[in-house]
Amino acid sequence: MISILMPIYNGIEFIEESVSSILNQTYDQWELIIGINGHPENSPVYKIAKEYEKKSGKVRVYDFHTIKGKSNTLNAMIQYCKYDHIALLDVDDMWHPQKLEIQSQYLNYYGVIGSKCIWFGDRPGVIPDIPVGDISNFDF
């Protein structure tokens, strides 16, 4: 089971794609905790996030508009996690539908996990260049 933390400060234009990529995961043992940072409860960002909370019992939205900074927001969000494993999702991220399924299988087998990303903006390609396969701390 995985708690997904999604702090939001800006990026209203990405919320729908990002949250949809979580709702469409093949692995269904997750919760999504959205932390709104820097926006009051009557803001468009907050209202959009609350709509997802209404649509899915797995999504919870919390108001952190008085907390400054992503790190401080993430630290505050951890108290709301139900599960031992935590994944971080930025508002401009989209996850492959099998991301959690594959990573949870790998984590259960190996006990440690890492990932790679694909840039989908104006710089196409895979970044960063991390070797595929078993890696150690020495590979970084």
Regions found by a protein language model. Name each.
Residues M1-F140:
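Nucleotide-sugar donor-binding/catalytic module of glycosyltransferases
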